[in-house]
């Protein structure tokens, strides 16, 4: 019942069809790229993978700043954060991005590049190798000083 209600509302309000429901992993990059913003109003979120996926697709995130969520760490500017449970602040953030399409486009590219540099598989491997080398060096220093 709610799904049908949302679909009718989306058909009336949106200029392009809304995709409500579950989607295959292979469909997600294109689906994400079809959006304008990634709104992440979660109160609690430990990993925030959806935020990283959206950013990788070039979406600017609008993230709830919550002590129970890791998502806020991904915001690169104040316009990407709003206080959790503050719907008026959320609306202001969305409106800001909609009212500044050049900034939205520019920051979509910045978020995508930032995600590639810091959260891609290649970036994760580089960080892991650096951490492993540091641990080996620390262990070698402990043995020398023992």
Show which residues each predicted segment covers.
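A charged, aromatic-enriched C-terminal amphipathic alpha-helix characteristic of glycosyltransferases
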Residues: 102-134, 139
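Short alpha-helical segment that forms part of, or immediately flanks, the ligand-binding pocket
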Residues: 29, 47, 51-56, 70-72
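Short alpha-helical donor nucleotide-sugar binding micro-motif in glycosyltransferases
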Residues: 22-23, 30-35
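A short hydrophobic beta-strand element within the catalytic core of glycosyltransferases
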Residues: 38-39
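Nucleotide-activated donor-binding/catalytic signature segment of Leloir-type glycosyltransferases, i.e.
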Residues: 4-23
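Conserved acidic donor-binding segment of nucleotide-sugar-dependent glycosyltransferases
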Residues: 76-87, 96-101
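Aromatic "clamp/platform" in nucleotide-sugar-dependent glycosyltransferases that forms part
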Residues: 43
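Short hydrophobic beta-strand element within catalytic cores of glycosyltransferases
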Residues: 60-65, 69
């Amino acid at each position: 019942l709610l799904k049908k209600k949302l679909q009718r509302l989306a058909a009336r309000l949106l200029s392009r069809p809304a995709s409500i429901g579950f989607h295959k992993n292979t469909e997600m990059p294109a689906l994400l790229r079809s959006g304008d913003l990634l709104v992440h109003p979660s109160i609690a979120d430990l990993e925030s993978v959806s935020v990283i996926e959206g950013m990788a697709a070039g979406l600017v995130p609008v993230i709830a700043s919550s002590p129970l969520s890791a998502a806020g760490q991904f915001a690169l500017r104040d316009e990407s954060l709003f206080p959790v449970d503050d719907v008026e602040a959320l609306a202001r953030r969305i409106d800001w991005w909609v009212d500044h399409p050049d900034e939205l486009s520019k920051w979509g590219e910045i978020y995508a590049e930032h995600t590639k540099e810091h959260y891609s598989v290649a970036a994760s491997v580089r960080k892991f190798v650096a951490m492993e080398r540091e641990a080996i060096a620390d262990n070698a220093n402990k043995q020398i000083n023992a």
